[in-house]
Amino acid sequence: MSKVASIVDVLQGKVAIGETVTVRGWVRTRRDSKAGLSFLAVYDGSCFDPIQAIINNDIENYESEILRLTTGCSVIVTGKVVESPAEGQAVELQAEKVEVTGFVEDPDTYPMAAKRHSIEYLREVAHLRPRTNIIGAVARVRHCLSQAIHRFFHEQGFYWVATPLITASDTEGAGEMFRVSTLDLENLPRSENGKVDFSQDFFGKESFLTVSGQLNGETYACALSKIYTFGPTFRAENSNTTRHLAEFWMVEPEVAFATLADNAKLAEDMLKYVFRAVLAERKDDLQFFEKHVDKDVITRLENFVNSDFAQIDYTDAIDVLLKSGKKFEFPVSWGIDLSSEHERFLAEEYFKSPVVVKNYPKDIKAFYMRLNDDGKTVAAMDVLAPGIGEIIGGSQREERLEVLDKRMEEMGLNPDDYWWYRDLRKYGSVPHSGFGLGFERLIVYVTGVQNIRDVIPFPRAPRNANF
């Protein structure tokens, strides 16, 4: 019995010329020659390229099955690995046996039958779109990046912590949260004042899907020193844009005894590590993106890993923008949150490199960010990258209980709702820092794919929860 091999192993020369091997996958194309040969391009998702299988018409099921094969049919091909005389790949399979495990019922109505589909159409058939070149490449890059992130933190001595998806806390204080409830919507229990009585709900109180694992992560950082979370988060933000999802993944490290400067260094080291990994491990997919999606993909990543990060205070960044002579769609003044056009100007035109903007006005940042001595700004940072703008947001956390309480009061938050978070400041409080990286935003940057809905398997967005 021949050994089963992935197509990537065969194409990369891990199977010797002359060895008989079995590959299993799906037909991308079939073409027939007048000389009684059929050529199947078979892929299994292990790499970008398919392998070519050459089938003689003397194979027993040639007339009955091979000539019926169309795009999407599943096959098991056993054959000898031979050198390929054609350009494009070094080896091909001289088929000795082809087992058809599944035909496409009606090739004329198979959604993936056409050679080219619009990316918008593919969203409507998200259950089949992994079979396309572009979404298959995105999936492999996504896997590579996630593994590189875990590897980076493991090598740096971090512990991965699983933070809850159901929470009673609003980390961002923005109120854009999905409610979790088992109450009967047709017959809601109400208290004497007419409000919904959440004490009768499953958790005995209001609960929501988390917008961030940060607050829970901080509790473990204040015991294990260096931790990170990596999981799904949810925002009930009614934004139908190419940059927003209702469900997305976040990478959130937290480090005890770390300053804002330590935080910026960690962000730089992590980004460069994962970009080096994807350049080394997914060259085939990046070359596809470079050819068909964004010609600057590889150059952008190479420039990033070879750049020193610039750093600038928010106040100085506002000054740079005001003196730039450039007319921005959103006017610039001290106290505004930088828009994408401002961020990209700083990274692409002014610094021409990644840049860390730090020390933002307190009024535009979250309650947990450490108040600076000037009383007007907080120790917050954003990492801006050429080609996309903000890619990471983080801060040194407020470790002083009285200052934290005052910030909560200013923002209309009830300290009692955060009693456990406040406890961290009562019992051996330490300076600590962390950041959040939107994982899908990272994939957009790496692949050049413009719409964030195309870099997550099943996008969740306003009025869209199919599949």
Curated annotation (Swiss-Prot):
It is an enzyme of class 6 (ligase). Disulfide bonds: none annotated. It is found in: Cytoplasm. One of its GO terms (biological process) is asparaginyl-tRNA aminoacylation. Its EC number is 6.1.1.22. It comes from the Bacteria. Keywords: Aminoacyl-tRNA synthetase, ATP-binding, Cytoplasm, Ligase, Nucleotide-binding, Protein biosynthesis. It catalyses: tRNA(Asn) + L-asparagine + ATP = L-asparaginyl-tRNA(Asn) + AMP + diphosphate + H(+). One of its GO terms (cellular component) is cytoplasm. Pfam families: tRNA-synt_2 (PF00152), tRNA_anti-codon (PF01336). GO terms for molecular function: asparagine-tRNA ligase activity; ATP binding; nucleic acid binding. Its main location: cytoplasm. PANTHER family: ASPARAGINE--TRNA LIGASE, MITOCHONDRIAL-RELATED, ASPARTYL/LYSYL-TRNA SYNTHETASE. Belongs to the class-II aminoacyl-tRNA synthetase family. Homodimer. NCBIfam families: asnS, PRK03932.1. This is Asparagine--tRNA ligase. It comes from Haemophilus influenzae (strain PittGG).
